């Protein structure tokens, strides 16, 4: 076995040996299906700690002819699939970890030459009669082997994008690397010697102008995951099973780590879920993953609407974006949407394909973004926070007149940034108004299923604050009075579902008169009859 060619199954065995392993081998049924077809070129991008390397190790263990993996996979999902052994350990597998190669190569400028030299050296051990010393190109070496023997290769590149991210301003390094990838995978000759190509990293494939640099690859991303959706992170069903096994509070786990919406799946951060199961501590595990420093300069770029969008999402709103203009690198940002799309790929935002909108997915990310914003002391954020604290205090004091005046003030000051021209707009203003709840409350739940309908907003206090802070059930009315909102809360029994969390509940009815441009408020304390 070599380091890059037929490296065996020991790396994947480490994952299987771990206390928690969630079976994602069902993905192999898809890669088996597309083997040696036009769909055999795959790029799957996902955030750090979302299982990129484990997936790459799994593919290597399954396809690599340098080991025997039948026993390893037979009890897993793929072991029950038809044709399980057809492709098992049948191919020469080249597995490259670009991040690892950076250090022995001596820096990003040497990575391509290092990979080429070391991989060809290992290939000569397998095919000494076919590869003369004169061959110094890896694509040419693979082509020569294929021509002489008919042998095709599975090529797996982990952290494919590290040179795009870490050498983002070195255009010479990037051009050399992109040309290397094109030589490996584009054109008629690679079609002959590639059985399967699998690239994985944080960013999708870099665009040259508006086209992917490797436009023969099918891309599965955090904005369009398709068949990969249940193999990126942990699904809700998988997390529920782990919570049952480890006796963890599922609803609290959902508040903290859920929120990535991929197709029909609610997807959780696997790193955080595993840490929670083992240590039973609800906290952010995100800052240890290395991207925190990257987002501070991103969110402070001077693009119209960027800071307002961040504040809106921190307060619980979603923001419509166009993810198609992002060039899939860390340099060529042209607008707010490019920054937000980048944050989606980094895992700091979720994305809803149906509404084309970005949002803060969970409490863990909400805390990290809030820290990043506070670190730069945004004037916009500090102003919002001060006015929001006054609004929250007035709500908790049941001072309805002050609540109405505070919301009206926020409306008047920020209506230019947040359009206040339709029935959904008061919801956005209300969310921003209660921005300061992020310290004491979980992310507000919109359209909370309760009683005989859906409450507009429900704010549930975090467990450590639940003795001092009531849950808030908030109903909005457009061109109706606030008392009507309170009656709806009571008649449709919205508080009953909230009593599963706490009996300390405030009912807040807020109305907006479009003609008069005024707000009214009624607040009552909930009491079971």
Residue map of PLM features:
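Metal-dependent nuclease catalytic cores in nucleic-acid-processing enzymes
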Residues: 183-191, 341-349, 431-436, 488-508
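Domain-level recognition of nuclease-like catalytic cores that cleave nucleotide substrates
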Residues: 497, 503-529
């Amino acid at each position: 076995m070599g380091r890059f060619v037929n490296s065996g199954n020991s790396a994947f065995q480490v994952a299987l040996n771990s206390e928690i392993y969630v079976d994602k081998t069902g993905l192999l049924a898809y890669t088996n299906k597309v083997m040696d077809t036009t769909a055999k070129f795959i790029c799957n991008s996902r955030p750090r700690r979302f299982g990129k390397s484990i997936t790459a190790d799994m593919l290597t263990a399954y396809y690599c002819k340098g080991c025997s993996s039948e026993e390893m996979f037979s009890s897993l999902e793929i072991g029950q699939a038809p044709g399980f052994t057809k492709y098992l350990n049948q191919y020469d597998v080249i597995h490259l970890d670009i991040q690892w190669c950076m250090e022995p190569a001596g820096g990003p400028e040497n990575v391509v030459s290092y990979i080429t030299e070391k991989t060809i050296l290992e290939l000569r051990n397998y095919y000494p009669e076919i590869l003369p010393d004169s061959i110094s190109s890896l694509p040419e070496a693979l082509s020569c082997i294929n021509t002489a023997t008919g042998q095709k290769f599975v090529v797996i590149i982990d952290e494919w994008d590290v040179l795009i991210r870490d050498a983002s301003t070195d255009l010479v390094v990037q051009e050399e690397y992109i040309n290397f990838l094109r030589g490996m995978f584009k054109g008629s000759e690679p079609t002959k010697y590639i059985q399967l190509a699998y690239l994985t990293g944080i960013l999708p494939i870099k665009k040259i102008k508006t086209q992917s640099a490797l436009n023969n690859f099918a891309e599965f991303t955090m904005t369009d995951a398709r068949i990969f959706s249940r193999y990126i992170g942990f699904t809700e069903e998988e997390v529920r099973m782990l919570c049952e096994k480890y006796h963890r509070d599922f609803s609290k786990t959902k508040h903290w780590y859920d929120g990535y919406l991929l197709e029909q799946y609610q997807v959780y951060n696997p790193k955080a879920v595993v840490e929670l199961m083992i240590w039973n501590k609800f906290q952010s595990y995100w800052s240890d993953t290395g991207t925190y420093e990257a987002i501070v300069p991103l969110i402070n770029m001077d693009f119209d609407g960027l800071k307002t969008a961040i504040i809106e999402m921190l307060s619980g709103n979603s923001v419509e974006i166009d993810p198609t203009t992002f060039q899939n690198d860390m340099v060529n940002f042209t607008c707010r949407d490019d920054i937000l799309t980048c944050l989606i790929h980094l895992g700091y935002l979720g994305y809803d394909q149906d509404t084309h909108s970005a949002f803060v997915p969970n409490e863990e990310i909400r805390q990290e973004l809030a820290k990043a914003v506070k670190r730069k002391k945004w004037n916009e954020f500090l102003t919002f926070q001060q006015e929001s604290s006054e609004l929250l205090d007035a709500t908790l004091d049941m001072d309805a007149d002050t609540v109405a005046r505070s919301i009206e003030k926020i409306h008047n000051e920020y209506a230019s940034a947040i359009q206040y021209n339709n029935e959904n707009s008061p919801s956005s203003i209300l969310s921003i108004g209660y921005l300061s709840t992020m310290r004491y409350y979980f992310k507000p739940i919109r359209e909370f299923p309760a009683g005989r309908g859906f409450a507009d907003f429900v704010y549930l206090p975090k467990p450590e604050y639940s003795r001092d802070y009531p849950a808030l059930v908030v109903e909005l009315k457009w061109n109706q009075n606030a008392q009507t909102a309170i009656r709806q809360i009571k008649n449709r029994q919205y508080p009953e579902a909230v009593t599963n969390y706490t009996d300390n509940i405030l009912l807040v009815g807020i109305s907006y008169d479009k003609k008069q441009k005024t707000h009214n408020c009624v607040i009552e304390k909930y009491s079971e009859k």
